[in-house]
Amino acid sequence: MRNFLCLSLALAAGAAHADAPAAAAAAVAPPGLQASQLAIVINDAEPNSVEVGEYYRKAHGIPAANVAHVNIPNRPRKLSIDQFAQLKERINAQLKPEIQAVLMVWSAPYAVECNAITAAFTLGYDGDQCAKTCDPGKPSKYFNSEAAQPYTQLGLRLSMLLPVDFVEEAKAVVDRGAVSGFSVPAASAYYLTTSDAVRNSRAGFFPPAGVVRQRKLTVKNLKADSLEGAQDIMVYQTGQAKVAKLDTLHFLPGALADHLTSFGGDLQGSSQMSSQRWLEAGATASYGTVSEPCSYWQKFPNPTVLLRRYLSGSTALEAYWGSVLWPAQGLFIGDPLAAPYAGFRR
């Protein structure tokens, strides 16, 4: 408990040292990411991207002017540095200055060399990380940030990817994200310490068990390799190469779920469970690394920070991005605008 309290105080103190212009901007800006500030990037070479992109726009009431179009044939898993530079230039040329975040509507590409495409887009390509993927990463300016307008205040356009391999599954993710803010359900956040010691590196950051009454949320810490039969999941974080019994679970709209493993972000890989399986099981957003990160907790969502941000009313995009200290290899997927606790945002 002492470690948890010390961590919380340290993070809060770090967030308090925002510069004066940033604080002033936050004071006059809308609280948090708005639909009008999100751009949707559609791959015109992929029919699923076109269909799901338009579905997303209508579901969240995003202006048609916020839609950017690119053409990426053949669904490559990975882009070279030059290919990515050209893609990013095409996207940025279509974005208005007030755009704070971007949703890429496709399943692939999802990597730029060893970087995840979302990290490369938001932070810029990190070649040093690719020299040795098991080295420590570079800190993100957005980690635990209270910046309400990340592009305006920090020069960072947060990004997420919505996989579209199966149109109906992608639309189901969108539906869950769109309804997530309508009411606050009674829910649970599950944190599993598994028998896989290497993949338990962030277990020390699991929030303590208890009840957050205002949010109707119960925090549960379990020593188990999998969760079975839970029907009230808002958060599920664990450490396993493959997570069993997902078909027995029910995720509530807006649920976040991820597993600490090497290749969760390798959406087309088969050696470990893809983070996309979480979305298929009913989660609304997830995270995974696209290249071998080694088990640094800093390369994965910090459970304490993630929960605090989400319960404070952040969107899934803001909560997930703000919870990863070294995100170069990490792919953020799902519906960025999901925000089941938006009513609590100040």
Regions found by a protein language model. Name each.
Residues A13-H17:
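N-terminal signal peptide c-region/cleavage motif recognized by signal peptidases
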Residues F4-A12:
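Sec-dependent N-terminal signal peptides
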Residues D19-R346:
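Cysteine-dependent hydrolase recognition
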